[in-house]
Amino acid sequence: MWSEGRYEYERIPRERAPPRSHPSDGYNRLVNIVPKKPPLLDRPGEGSYNRYYSHVDYRDYDEGRSFSHDRRSGPPHRGDESGYRWTRDDHSASRQPEYRDMRDGFRRKSFYSSHYARERSPYKRDNTFFRESPVGRKDSPHSRSGSSVSSRSYSPERSKSYSFHQSQHRKSVRPGASYKRQNEGNPERDKERPVQSLKTSRDTSPSSGSAVSSSKVLDKPSRLTEKELAEAASKWAAEKLEKSDESNLPEISEYEAGSTAPLFTDQPEEPESNTTHGIELFEDSQLTTRSKAIASKTKEIEQVYRQDCETFGMVVKMLIEKDPSLEKSIQFALRQNLHEIESAGQTWQQVPPVRNTEMDHDGTPENEGEETAQSAPQPPQAPQPLQPRKKRVRRTTQLRRTTGAPDITWGMLKKTTQEAERILLRTQTPFTPENLFLAMLSVVHCNSRKDVKPENKQ
């Protein structure tokens, strides 16, 4: 039904066109306008073909079309014929008021909106959604007024080939801006610009209702195309994943099979080497710190011992000067002490001397000092320091057996100094180093006499 009404002009021959000499006969006009109702639902310029056929006898169809609209909307609108005659290249603004009056009148009487009525047409559905056609108006056979090519050869269904591609570019863009952006990106579509400007001029009419209806028309295909796009994207992603899985799975499995073996074998070896190396470094650092501490301690002891020996030598000289009879006894004791010092000095290079711990300052015997030293907790060490201890113990026992004089120790020196201080207190002499030294000499002399007397008695 729609196709017959739309292309009715093609079937009417030129000889049967209504003449201009009967303008008053409204009945004939109404009868002739009956098959033109479906084109009235379309936009002006798309369905009527008198703009392409510039024959003189077809001017009455414009008058009849305007009369049919005016008959419904109100009083007839009579203007110049130049406003109703549309040529091939003249797209002036005189068409807009005519289209505005027709559209307003049709909206008052019709029950459905213009885009809904157009949507029911099988031929106009795609054209309203996708206004760009693969072939421009100028290239179509309708653009030539005098051509003998039939208008049936040009079908609007050709525009369906680019429907899916064009829907991706026209989702939420205004109709005027979308044409400019697409034509700027594609220089091949420069021929379609005059036709597209004509369509945008119709769309951007000053009434607000047409803008709302056009936005609704554009929203409907965008919803449909979003579903189609989602389905197509899901299918494409599934195919791509299948291809990538088939191509990459064997490579990944081979890589994992080859890479896992050396990884598990190499990982446990590294921490063992690191731990052993760290333990060795820790032990070396401990040994170095211990050796440094021992060396510093031995130096301090040697310095103190030398000072004591020097002082003791000076005291002995002063005693001999005052009492030359004490020279033999003192020399014998000093030789023994010097021999012990030499033997102990050789061992002190390896182990610190334990000479001071053998007897406390209070005069305790050597065994008690050794017991306390052995009972004290000591860190585990190598068996090297044990050998010199045994040698030293043997040496001391041998010296005790061979010598009859007692060993001079720090305890004995302390006792002599205490006795010398007592002598100075008794005599009320000042505590000067010289007086103290002399008192110590007297104490040593008295003790030596005590030790010599029992030997003479035996």
UniProtKB/Swiss-Prot annotation:
Keyword Nucleotide-binding: no
Entry's localization field: Nucleus; Cytoplasm; Chromosome
Repressor recorded as keyword: yes
Motif (Nuclear localization signal): 103-109
Coiled coil, from the record: none
Sequence positions bearing Phosphoserine: 110, 114, 133, 140, 161, 167, 197, 201, 205, 325
Name of this chain's protein: Periphilin-1
Species whose genome carries this gene: Homo sapiens
GN (gene name): PPHLN1
